Amino acid sequence: MKKTLNMSSGFTLLEVIFVIVIIGILAGVAIPKLAATRDDAEIAKAKSTIASVRAALSTERQLRVLRGDFTPITSLNADGAGAFTVFSLDGGVGGNPPVSRPVLGNTVPICAPGGRACWNAAAPVYTYILPISGNLVTFSIQDAGGTYSGQFRCTGNANDCRLLTQ
């Protein structure tokens, strides 16, 4: 007499359906979190850019004062190649020709049409477009009276300013 073993390997239909349901639940929870994380990263990048621009502006102002040059900084993109490329020319103190130093170590590109989470520049006003709402948040290097203050102040909506500067 011959014995045959009936060994079947594989998953039952119930097990496969159970795994598919669990994967669906996990995907439903994870995908919205990943989308929010990307927007949070864009906001963090904008905050970092703002802090870097403010530090560079303060440093440039102090360098000019130390050299006895009180020429106001009127632009952060004097060459028009990006949002924060080079400062406007200094006064060329001590017989030196006027120079324009870089604002940041990298060029921040201008927004493409319809872009979000990017910068636009039209000195003395610089605008950031929020990634989620598309709201414009404006920053200026002029004070309310039109004087070039050497500060990079948020002049837009208070809530949007708070989001980017705190």
Residue ranges and their predicted role:
Residues 1-11:
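N-terminal leader/signal peptides at the extreme start of proteins
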Residues 4, 33-51, 60, 64:
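Aliphatic-rich helix starts adjacent to a transmembrane/signal segment
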Residues 17-33:
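Alpha-helical hydrophobic helix detector
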Residues 27, 55-58:
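Alpha-helical transmembrane segments of multipass membrane proteins
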Residues 57-98:
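Short, glycine/small-hydrophobic-rich surface segments
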Residues 76, 115-120, 139:
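Short, exposed beta-strand/loop patches in secreted or surface proteins that constitute
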Residues 124-166:
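Short, surface-exposed interaction loops/tails
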